[in-house]
Amino acid sequence: LERTSQGWLNRAAELGVANPSRYDTCAWADFDHDGSVDLFVNGTVGGGGHYRDWLMRREGDINFIDVTPTEILERNASHGATWVDYDLDGDLDLALAGSAIDGTHALLENLLRPEFAWHSLQVRVLDEKGHSTRPGSEVRLFVSGTDRLLGTRRVDSGSGYDAQSDLPVHFGVPGGQKVDVEITVPGGGRRSVTRIDGVDPRMYQGRSLEVRTDHR
């Protein structure tokens, strides 16, 4: 649903995500580091059947295409899904949980080529004491020295069904270029903004950029 001046517009069909099915959860992430967010949708189990899962890659500005690998289709996972760089190689991996009688909990490693895997930046938003108490904060990345927006993420600690989001927000950074980071923390009737300019993603391989923000 896209919010317009006339109300809400359903664009699912034209974007290629209007798949007739039943789902438990979805998870957005730029798993290929092209600068656009991609979509994983987890099919539910019910009525004696299992609805298939979908991994949809964003192509250009207006299309998603189905790139679901057999490794996902064979798992028949449902319910939980979250993206996380568990092996700290720069790209996002996918953790899945299910409701089958014999149990399913798959951890799928993203095998993005190393030269592209490190075209990324993870940002962990902290409070003034260094604690992760800033859910709801907005993180924006700009091409360094410009107002060209590369992406926006929200610090999310609770989304997902049978899953919890990883607290660092993850950005694909095409070309691994330097970026300016802007963090907005809402609370107490105001919006506090913190900026760090000229961040080189290569300096944060295998770790997150940790940013302490002002008191709300």
Predicted regions, residues:
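Short, conserved, GDST-rich strand-edge loop motifs in beta-rich repeat architectures
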Residues: 42-49
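Disulfide-stabilized cysteine-rich extracellular repeat microdomains
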Residues: 5, 13-16, 31, 45, ...
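Beta-propeller blade repeat segments, especially FG-GAP/WD-type strand-to-loop junctions
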Residues: 1-11, 49-66, 102-118
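Gly/Ser/Thr/Pro-enriched helix-cap/hinge segments flanking short amphipathic alpha-helices
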Residues: 63, 69-74, 82, 88-216
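Beta-propeller blade termini
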Residues: 23-33, 79-88
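Beta-rich catalytic cores
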Residues: 22-25, 51, 77-79, 103
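Short loop/turn motifs that recur once per blade in beta-propeller domains
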Residues: 9-22, 65-76, 130-131
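Acidic/hydrophobic-patterned starts of short beta strands in beta-sheet-rich repeat architectures
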Residues: 33-42, 89-97
